[in-house]
Amino acid sequence: MEESKNEATNRAHVLFDRFVQATTCKGTLKAFQELCDHLELKPKDHRSFYHKLKSKLNYWKAKALWAKLDKRGSHKDYKKGKVCTNTKCLIIGAGPCGLRTAIDLSLLGAKVVVIEKRDAFSRNNVLHLWPFTIHDLRGLGAKKFYGKFCAGAIDHISIRQLQLILLKVALILGIEIHVNVEFRGLVEPPEDQENERIGWRALVHPKTHPVSEYEFEVIIGGDGRRNTLEGFRRKEFRGKLAIAITANFINRNTTAEAKVEEISGVAFIFNQKFFQELREATGIDLENIVYYKDDTHYFVMTAKKQSLLDKGVILHDYADTELLLSRENVDQEALLSYAREAADFSTQQQLPSLDFAINHYGQPDVAMFDFTCMYASENAALVREHNGHQLLVALVGDSLLEPFWPMGTGIARGFLAAMDSAWMVRSWSLGTSPLEVLAERESIYRLLPQTTPENVSKNFSQYSIDPVTRYPNVNVNFLRPSQVRHLYDTGDTKDVHLEMENLVNSRTTPKLARNESVARSSKLLGWCQRQTDGYAGVNVTDLTMSWKSGLALCAIIHRYRPDLIDFDSLDEQNVEKNNQLAFDIAEKELGISPIMTGREMASVGEPDKLSMVMYLTQFYEMFKDSLPSRDASDLNAEERAVLIASTKSPISFLSKLGQTISRKRSPKDKKEKDLDGAGKRRKTSQSEEEDTPRGHRGARPTLVSTLTDRRMDVALGNQNKVKYMATQLLAKFEENAPPQSVGVRRQGSIKKEFPQNLGGSDTCYFCQKRVYVMERLSAEGKFFHRSCFKCEHCATTLRLSAYAYALEDGKFYCKPHYCYRLSGPAQRKRPAGVPLSGKEARGPLQDSPAADASGRPSTSASPAERSPGPSVNGLEEPSVAKRLRGTPERIELENYRLSVRQAEGLEEVPEETQAEHNLSSVLDTGTEEDAASSSSESEMEEEEPPLPTSDLGGVPWKEAVRIHALLRGKSEEELEASRSFGAGEEEEEDEEDEEEEEEEEDEEDEEEDEDESSEVGSPRRLQQLLNPADPLEIQADVHWTHIRESQEERAALAPKSPLPGVPFDEDDLERDVDSEPAEIKGEAAENGDAGDTGAELDDDQHWSDDVPSEANTELHLPAVGAELELRVSDGEEEPPPASVGHPERGPSRVSSPTRSPEEPTGLSSPARSPGAQSAHPPLAAVATGVRSPAESPLPEPSTPPAEPEAHPPIRSQPEARTPPSPASPQRPSPPTQLPICSQPQPSPEATVPSPTLSPIRSQPVPARTSTPLAPLPVKNQGVTKDTLGSSLPGDEALKRSDLVAEFWMKSAEIRRSLGLTPVHRSPGSELAFQSPPLKACPAEKAPQSEGLRLLKPPPVPRKLGLPAAEGAQPCPPTPVSPPDREPKGPREEHRDLSSSSGLGLQGSSSRTRTPGSQSFNTSDSTMLTPPSSPPPPPPDEEPATLHRKPALAGQLVASAPPPPAVCVRPPREPTQPPQEEARKSFVESVDEIPFADDVEDTYDDNTCDDRTEDSSLQETFFTPPSHWPHPKQPLAPENGRGPESAVPLQKRGLPLVSAEAKELAAERMRAREKSVRSQALRDAMARQLSRMKEMDIAAAAPRTPRTPAPRRATAVPPKGPEEPAPRHEATSEELLSPPSDSGGPDGSVTSSEGSSGKSKKRSSLFSPRRSKKEKKPKGEGRPLERPSPGTLEEAAAKPRSLWKSVFSGYRKDKKKSDGRSCPSTPSSGTTVDAGKPRASPVSRAELRTRRQLSCSEDSDLSSDDVLERTSQKSRKEPRTYTEEELNAKLTRRVQKAARRQAKQEELKRLHRAQIIQRQLEQVEEKQRQLEERGVAVEKALRGEAGMGKKDDPKLMQEWFKLVQEKNAMVRYESELMIFARELELEDRQSRLQQELRERMAVEDHLKTEEELAEEKRILNEMLEVVEQRDALVALLEEQRLREKEEDKDLEAAMLSKGFSLHWS
């Protein structure tokens, strides 16, 4: 009996495993049915099914899943599943959104039935996931079903895989799922309800299916079709012809493939060079491209029609898009070749083999879609009531809102809509009236199209079906029930239509009326008369002859801008001159394009009335609300400047920035609405295009622009100061603006007259055809059609805001090709360009049907494109029915199905065959299951990227079909079993943990590592993108180059590194330990261990962009000198987070505290490398336990111990190397890794990073300069502080000189770290370097670490448990390091820290990450800021904190609460209030930390607790490292050990520290796991810690002061509070962010993090876990932070942060915090980081490892699980990890985190570019429609339509209306171009930084004069870019402020007019 019972139980477990591991739809259903049969369960009983299943399946793997589902189901909104118990729901379509909706309805207790037309999931296409979707799916147990789910930095998943996950969850919850059932319609309730009470039913096929008998109260359409459910009207969004191509290639999961960098998205507007190179090399012309590595290699791109025609993909050019893309008109072989060529080029030919995966027809999986038109449903739901039965009908997914695929919004908005629909059903079931239900649903739906990852709520753990938890400012009662009555269908369709018409009219009539009042010619004439009244010789009586003399125009301009025209000097007789003067000034100063020339005006008898109306209307709209100058004669100078600014056009502003723009003032309100992230702004612009029926849409822009402009102008009064400042800056910028743009743009003004050889303004300059007023554009005195305005070289359509004009030949070019003008046209000249699309080709257009009535080609699109026509319903298209029926992909799939069946008679290939062919390697290796298993396993997996490839993998699909029989023969269960066999054990461990959040995060991290291991490829991916992508230049280009150079340098330097032997040992160790041979091999093999890592690091750096570079620089800096230190610290105040850079700091410290911060930045570079590390951090996390991911940012020190797990260490080590090789050189500096572990090595590390750093630095430099960089150089304790303090004030002055000095110093330091003779800029640095480079670093670090220790001793008590151990161990090291340090002196002490920075790096890296991330965020865009609420402040605060530590510390603390610990340290300044503020900040940061890190935070915090204190203290000391020689004793115990370690490592060698480090790591891991065991515990601890920190800060103040007195003399008072604060902070952070504060390394992290930014610190420290998971990006940020330079960069790149604010509203705070924090944060942060990490990298690593283990155990794993893992790890990984290895691990983690952060940043920037691109296309299409209507009206008015000339008032009224709309579109376009310009500058800045980094990697004495001059040139150019961005941001900010007050009224007005939706 017992045996049979056990057998049955085991059988159930096997069946459950088979179900979980099933990889096909049918296999899943079959496995589930078998499980239910075995357990004797019947899914029909939906209410109790799940509970019965749970009770009968007592399996530890299942329990982890039950725990997750129980947690989700226990949410109060579901009311224990009793809300909808009597509600029956039918969901059409088992796609991701349909299944997600079903799950929520099931949790509400409803009876849910899902019907799916097919029985196979065959879509390999990849979906981008927003952070909240990842969190949501994790909560549903996604990782239990798919172990690789979003591991590491992965943020995407294939549709097939996502469907499988959701299908399994749905089945477990008792949802009925029927496949092969097609919905055909609704069956109304019969009229005879007396005999049979039958409700609503579904008509399905097959008709006899049981579902046809079901009755439903709710039906939800989620099948992606547009017409499945009737009654939903659709809004059409039409852009330019958009042809999308998707391609899936087989992914064999080889090492080579793993190394290929993903392309998260590249848009033409974002990276033109890449696409131009692609076109020149292959003839392929794309708008954008995305590459995701998933089950397949997935590519999706938007191709230009002409390119497809040229390449023979499309055979004939048709106007109708359906004909154009029909199978008969497409050459499939050419299409395959086209897709393969594009994929090959975009990945830099690095994918070894591009074999197509097969679709479900056995054909290559390549498809082409028409995305020209996209639709959104006007409503989300409606109610039908027939014969007494009500039916709630709703839409979700693509059926509701079609996404623009490059935006990656589809699945996220689909999930949001699914939750909103569930909430609606809940309200419905609770008895709410139908109209109220609909009103609430529509109120919520209006927000959906505006959602972005930045403007949804950030507290993902609070998400529920309640909209309030997801939308920050939702008003669920926005619409009244009476406003949705038309959605209540009672069967009387007549009434419904009448109601709808009334509603539409009520919405649009007011707007039209207003437009009419504005448009009346009498009103315009009256306004002109008032403006010209009193001017001599001016008498305006009409809109024609009165203006001929030109005086009236000049009078209007003079009235508002008397500074532009000397009216009294004008001669009334000189008509031509007067008019030309007015035209030129209006274009140049006001952005109003001329409609004719002065000569033309003088030559005509009577000016053309239509042209004059068009022209004067622009003046009216610009000045109507402005105050005439005469009335302002009594204004003071400032107010007058404000007035001038108010009439300045953004376009003219842009042109002065080197952008040739000639347009009207920008539609500020739309600009922000569209791009800001803020829903409101978006709404407005959106409303134009989508809210109401197309008929009224035209008027909308007018309303929007009118309202906006008026309010904007009215609000000018007090908000113009910013604009005034921007105007003031213009003069400077005009001098600095890129010569090309300036020259190019203004050249035209010289020659404004209309060319004599042409007819005039009514003749096109290009095609010589008639140009009507409405379609007329002018530039450089030429008039032309919009469609004729193309680049002479490449035929790309130009915009007035971005072109280059060659005066010598009168030709126009796109900016990238302006330099080709002398070399003649390229192979593809304009003729080829015509291909762009029939619509775009000027001359060739005529042949296409696009030519319009006027006989000229249609301006906008080729006939094909136009065919869709403006009609809302698409009636003009033959394919209307199809278009209304399905989405682009569905139409293509259906066409494909029909054509394939007809032509080839192919049948569908079974899902199993398809999966076997496409995913053979994955299936064979059981990767999915294994990955999911456990963190250790994940790590292993991660480290073994190469997976065995299946024999079938490369087999052609036909061959696969042949094997079909065999495949079928093998049951899916067997396949799954074999697949998951490997995953079994480890997976079990993982799942046992159940609460695998941390575990998952670990896995994620590990997998991310894997990913990132591929990211070694990652760097390459970037390279691929970046190199080819100079277009990608924004982020990639520079970085790639840098990476390569760095790698080469590394290869050369590796031997030179101070500890070449050590580095190599570390590499070897890493290899040995690493269970990821692939990664290691790749790294080692490719670059001699260093090379590959270098690539990885580079990648990370690239991703992190600025941060890693800074970190690297910092590393180099230590060797550099005080001078360098000054610069570095200024720029690298943020670097402090780069505690990794401590080694650098050490030397720097010696030179100058400021410097040291920069050095940390150097370490930061590793932190950035953390991009790589971030990939590795997961491994560390696994090793560490849950912590590694989160830890990676702060607990990195622990992480190394955690990393002791075989994989983590290996990862870490490579990562460490990678960090060292942020610049390629780093790789060769395995010693660099050692530096992470040992102090000497940091030098090399620094060296490598330095190159990277310099570019980064250069960018941050300005900010740093602002911060007391100079003081940092003082490097001496007192001086540093004071200097820092003063530095802030001297921000501007310091900027350039500091930058230059910083670069020199960096360069020297880099050389040192590389092992070359560094240029000693300061005795300190020389001293540090005197000892072996490592030793020098240790020496400098040593004193610092001592100081830190002094500070730390108090923290140690707090840490007690861990701290005690940590402290004890550190103590021995401390003694050692103290001696070293003492001899070395404070500087050397710092250096010691530097060398220990390896460890410190770990800790630092985590902390660094925070700053890095912050910095990264800042630099990339505010968008990054959102991920970490603290970041916005941190960016500013980070710098402030660092600088502040010396001088602003106190202040900054208050300003930047998030990084209180850091702040606390910075407050070392004597000011006590600042200290208090710091304390407060700390508390706040602590509180924020838990929030930011969520569970992960808690975990990290616990782990870090001990260390946090220390690290905080250390950090505090760090700022004034020079002052801290004495503190070294206190620090010695905890941090001292780090220093001792560092020194001993340097002196004794890694071995001594190695054992200790291991032990410490193990202890720390355990402690952390324990502390993080439960989220609640963590949160509580975090809160307690924050309180304790405050108290401690107060208490510690006294303690700390004494220790830091010597060095910190200046900052001693703040230091006191700071010290205590750091401890408390450390304590809190330990709980919240153990990595940073808890260990020496952690401490360093904390300090750097703290310094980099409170928010960041918070995130990183408190998000050990979060770092791993949701915060991983933040963690990355930290690694980035580590390159605090990134933070500095933020400060330096204020424009970036400002830009961010433009989008996310962080600008104000950021500015404030930036100003303050930048200065102090870099130096203090850097100093602290350097000292602490250096203190005892190894021991800390060990402690950290222990803590990580304990933390991860607590949070995710059961203690047993953790122990099991630990033992496994022990067996797997030789416990002989040396400090180097541990450091390498940490470094890798840091790199991964940085890489991850950078990737997110790039993705956000990409999305911004794509938003702009898409909106520009919308504007272009709308302008084309307006032009067509305008031409028709103009012809009628002129009598050209064969009707004779008419002066019909109605026609004139229509003309006025069209003119207004066009003006609105012009303004809107100019706004978009400003945003595009900002992106361009951001990109340029990024590239320059990278180039500078690379150059700084070479020692100055090895450079030629030319090279040195080039460095200076690059620096100057970068400063110019920063200034331009500042000015742009100031302009945007001013506009934002002006709109702030109007927003509420404007939003209300717009919404009331129907402008509520803006979808893209």
UniProtKB/Swiss-Prot annotation:
This is [F-actin]-monooxygenase MICAL3. SMART domains: CH (SM00033), DUF3585 (SM01203), LIM (SM00132). Residues 1779-1952 form a coiled coil. One of its GO terms (molecular function) is FAD binding. Residues 984-1014, 1485-1503 have a biased composition (Acidic residues). Zn(2+) 2 binds at residues 791, 794, 814, 817. FAD binds at residues 97, 116-118, 123-125, 183, 298, 398. GO terms for cellular component: cell cortex; cell projection; midbody; nucleus; spindle. Residues 1394-1406, 1594-1611, 1633-1653 have a biased composition (Low complexity). Interacts with RAB1B, RAB8A, RAB10, RAB13 and RAB15 (in their GTP-bound forms); binding to RAB1B is of low affinity compared to other Rab proteins; at least in case of RAB8A can bind 2 molecules of RAB8A simultaneously through a high and a low affinity binding site, respectively. Interacts with ERC1 and RAB8A; may bridge ERC1 with RAB8A. Interacts with KIF23 and ERC1; enhances the interaction between KIF23 and ERC1. Interacts with NINL. Its cofactor is FAD. Residues 658-704, 826-887, 906-1295, 1316-1550, 1564-1782 are annotated as: Disordered. It comes from the Eukaryota. It is found in: Cytoplasm; Cytoplasm, Cell cortex; Cytoplasm, Cytoskeleton; Nucleus. Zn(2+) 1 binds at residues 764, 767, 785, 788. GO terms for biological process: actin filament depolymerization; cytoskeleton organization; exocytosis. The bivalent Mical/EHBP Rab binding (bMERB) domain, mediates binding to predominantly Rab8, Rab10, Rab10, Rab13 and Rab15 (in their GTP-bound forms). Its EC number is 1.14.13.225. Residues 1277-1286, 1407-1425, 1718-1727 have a biased composition (Polar residues). It catalyses: L-methionyl-[F-actin] + NADPH + O2 + H(+) = L-methionyl-(R)-S-oxide-[F-actin] + NADP(+) + H2O. Residues 2-494 are annotated as: Monooxygenase domain. The modification Phosphoserine is found at residues 649, 685, 687, 971, 1129, 1139, 1156, 1188, 1250, 1254, 1286, 1313, 1404, 1660, 1663, 1870. The modification Phosphothreonine is found at residues 887, 1252, 1317, 1425. Residues 1654-1672 have a biased composition (Basic residues).
